[in-house]
Amino acid sequence: MKRWLKLAAGAAAVTLATAGCAGSSGTDTAASSSGAPAPITGDVTVWLMTGSAPATLTDALNKEFEAAHPGVKVKYEIQQWDGIQQKLTTALAGGTPPDVIEIGNTQTAAFASNEGVLTDLTADKDSFNGAQWLKGLADSGTYEGKVYGVPFYAANREVIYRKDMFEQAGITKTPTSNDEWIDAITKLKTKFGSDPDFQALYMPGQNWYSLLSFIWDNGGDIAQPDGKKFKATLDSAGAKAGLEFYKKLVDTSGTKAPKDADEAKPQQATVYGGGKVAMMIGLPWELPTAAKTDPSLTAKTGAFAIPSKTAGQTAPVFLGGSNLAIPANSKNVAAAKEYIKLLSSPKYQSQLAAAGVVPGTSTDLTGLDKDPLGSVMAKASTNGKAVPASPQWGDVESGQNPVKDMLTAYLTGKKTLDQATADANAALNKLIGG
Amino acid sequence: MTATANVTMPAGATPPASPRDTRAKKRRRGRFGDRVLPYLLLLPALAAILVLLAWPLVQVLAISFRKLDIGQLVSGKTVWIGFDNYTNTLSDPEFWTVTFRTLVFTAAIVAATILGGLLLAVLMRHLGPVVRIIVQVTLVLAWATPVIATTTVFQWIFDEQYGILNKTLDRLGFHGFIGFSWFSSGASTLSVIGLLIVWQAVPFVTFSLYAGIIGVSREQYEAAGIDGASAWQTFRAVTWPAIKPITTMVTFLSVLWDFNAFAQIWAIREGGPDGGSTTLAVVLYLKGIAGNHFGAAAAIATLMLIVLALITGRYIQLLTRTREGDLS
């Protein structure tokens, strides 16, 4: 009884908060757009996520912004990813929301699809360097033709590998096709297989972002737009071929990773740090995590783009990242727009690139070149894609992800390929099809 | 205490009308004060219950008839949709599967908890003081460990690669358990979760029942011994009547707690694999917190309350019918 009532009390508290603070939106957007830019006044509250932009960047940005707009104070707050959706929901429902927010790209549609939650930024696209937006991110911030999210930054996965092990196994060049990749795994196993702890490729059963690459590479997709809704296409031939290749990687490599967990349980970087893993599919900043266990790994590690089934090409990759948005009931939309304008300028975008991520509003990726892992990621990012911009996509990721269940069921042999894909397709349709 | 006690009447004289009147008034006022005072004293508690329990309950009920997604939450619009949340929930066959699973799961772990607690309580009566204290300290430790900490320990015990259980079974000769996944099916996952919940619930039940057992006077056991009663007969005739009311109460409490169990289920496999260990509490979380569909979640919460009221109705009936909480 008590626990139930706690839940009830929590739900009611949210309602009370809304009931008390509703109805204060939409009146103060008109001030900015007549002729000469009106002077901006008041404070602007900015919420960026932890780890998004280095402090040197934001310090300089906030300083420049305040210098350009005397009298405006930037209230800069760093947020944690854990529980951010609830925190944003509560903040947006409150009377004084932050003026600039960062939203994960897979969550943007959930906020954008509800009218009156985010400010429509379609008319301002050009002032945010709209010509150079990263396509995969721009798609995730657009809902029914209107722009609600401005690309901030993105990152995508690549194959991180041990150069020294490749050399010892006699692999002279990094794989450029799926066949060469499988071939490399076999060679590595022949060379190091006598060590029972060795894994040629660390591949947990639920690394579904990697599965997306394989599905897209085989011409499939997880869902297709169907009018205003989405229709799951996990039972398509392309999706099945992607799954089959995933299983081939798992089986050939003989990975000891759990089949019912993703790359975060346990953190694959820590496993890689143990020194018995020749490859993993990960993000560039997982290397520093691994190097905490074994600093010598930094020099021994390289990266190559996820190969395609077509020799010489690379597979499309899932673009993970963030968009910037302005809540509809922000009290200072004009200042918020100026702030995003400054952040999307080439000066700060190149600093983002130098910090190791793909900038959202600039095609200049030279900042990533000095880092071997970053440059590989930058090249692959041009072939980046996003998950379906369905308002319900948040349900898929924060709840029980049917794609993960499908992977585990198929890899463990509990379901056949046809059964696993059919079940997952039905489950996905239930979540995003309605 | 009463106002009438010390009133003396002048003998042989007709008492004047006026003092009598005032006396009567006084008496009435005194009675009124006596009658009101308990309620006044109850008022703070009542206010707290109204604000913290009743009002949220009414709110949840109201929300369950509304469409309340993130859009409505931010814009503050109230959209009434009648029974849509209920019909949508009840027409989903998955909901009935989950309800059935939750009921079976609750019944199984409540039975295991009560049985385990009862056995341990009876055992403790027969133990020497030193061993008993060791058992009691162990129980308190199991009880006092935070839920998530115990859950993490259980996750490691049952881990397919590095878990101590699989390693031990392998050493004992059951080599099939190398790399065996305890979380590959819903039933197996729920068994592990059930064991975990029972593990944490048994100490409370044991201590409650043991308190009942030590309330039985030693003479009764001695008398049973002289009559030549067996252990089972002693339990039936002496122990059981003494602890029956407490058993009823802890069963009732266990039903409430286990039916709503969430933290352990979510922490182990988030209701997986493939939704196989999803209970009503998990559905509630998925709808409300993960999916931001507060209206639909409120409907599920209301339905859960109704189910709970149905299965605990018998106890509440006993509670209201008997005096002084005598539930035997």
Regions inferred by a protein language model and the residue ranges of each:
Chain A
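Conserved N-terminal structural module of periplasmic/extracytoplasmic solute-binding proteins
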Residues: 2-110, 295, 310-312, 334-335, ...
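Extracytoplasmic/periplasmic solute-binding protein
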Residues: 148-152, 157, 182-232, 277
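Extracytoplasmic/periplasmic substrate-recognition and gating elements
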Residues: 63, 67, 169, 248-255, ...
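Long, aromatic- and glycine/proline-rich binding clefts that accommodate carbohydrate-like moieties
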Residues: 136-139, 304-305, 353-401
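Glycine-centered hinge/linker elements that transmit conformational signals in sensory
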Residues: 185-186, 229-260, 306
